Amino acid sequence: MREDLLRNSVEFLREKTVLDAPDVKKIEFLKSKGLTAEEIQEAFKLAKNPLFPSYPRFENTSNFVSRDWRDWFIMGVISTGFAWSAYSLVKKYIAPMFRAPSQNAYEADKNALDAKFLEAHKILENLDEQTRKLSERTEKQQDELDIALDDLEETLNTLKRTSENRDREIARISQDVYTMSTITLPQSLEQIKKSQEEALQNLSREISSLRCLQTDSKKDDTFATTSNSSIPVLENPLDTSEGFQTKKVGTASLPDWQISMHNEASKNIDFNDIDPAESYVAEDAY
């Protein structure tokens, strides 16, 4: 059997509030607690047994001792001492708890509260001042930050515009370089080549003409030397300041304009500086 459950059932059946209840309700209650029929019967048996063994009662036949005045006096003194001690304790420790404070205590408490209020007011003022300074500092920093952001935005816009201008300039330069390399430069080189060819042709013609003049001049000098003995010469020199030279009169002399051109060209050109190869090229071109 389950001893603990059985013991609890016995204690339940011995309670005063349960003794007057019908057995049917007791059995139903014990069954609801999980007891079996055997355990319930055992519990009823144990509950009916007395808790303590019965002993025979003996009557106290002794007479009470009578008390005299001394006993009462001692009892009174002891009671008075206890009462006085209790009164002293109550007066010293308990009564002040319920006693109203004096005017001085009120004033002291009031002054203490005023001091606390003043201290709290100062703390609040300091807190308000610090909050105001913090707010001003925050606003100032916000303004500086806004200015810095505006400057940064302006700088970025400037850099963007500069980059766009640089890109356009690079594109223009690239276009110019492309145009120059594909159109302008070839045309210029072609024009320079043509100009050089024309200059070389002109120079070759001039050199050929000068060579012819030089050849004619040599022939004239030879002819004049051979005919000096038989042909009279009119010695009538012209003014050299006007750039004229002496004329040779004879039957085989050159015209005056050809002689003047030959002499003028001979003064300005040194035929020793002419490259024979260039002369050959000029003669071929001519």
Curated annotation (Swiss-Prot):
Pfam family, one: Pex14_N
Coiled coil regions, renumbered to chain: 122-214
GO function term, MF aspect, one: signaling receptor binding
Family annotation (Gene3D superfamilies): Winged helix-like DNA-binding domain superfamily/Winged helix DNA-binding domain
Ribonucleoprotein in keyword set: no
Sorted UniProt keywords: Coiled coil, Membrane, Peroxisome, Protein transport, Translocation, Transport
Biological processes annotated in GO: protein import into peroxisome matrix, docking; protein targeting to peroxisome
InterPro entries the record matches: PEX14, Pex14_N, WH-like_DNA-bd_sf
Quaternary structure note: Interacts with PEX13 (via SH3 domain); forming the PEX13-PEX14 docking complex. Interacts with PEX5 (via WxxxF/Y motifs).
Family from the record: Belongs to the peroxin-14 family.
Function of the molecule: Component of the PEX13-PEX14 docking complex, a translocon channel that specifically mediates the import of peroxisomal cargo proteins bound to PEX5 receptor. The PEX13-PEX14 docking complex forms a large import pore which can be opened to a diameter of about 9 nm. Mechanistically, PEX5 receptor along with cargo proteins associates with the PEX14 subunit of the PEX13-PEX14 docking complex in the cytosol, leading to the insertion of the receptor into the organelle membrane with the concomitant translocation of the cargo into the peroxisome matrix.
Protein name listed in UniProt: Peroxisomal membrane protein pex14
Source organism per UniProt: Schizosaccharomyces pombe (strain 972 / ATCC 24843)
Gene label: pex14
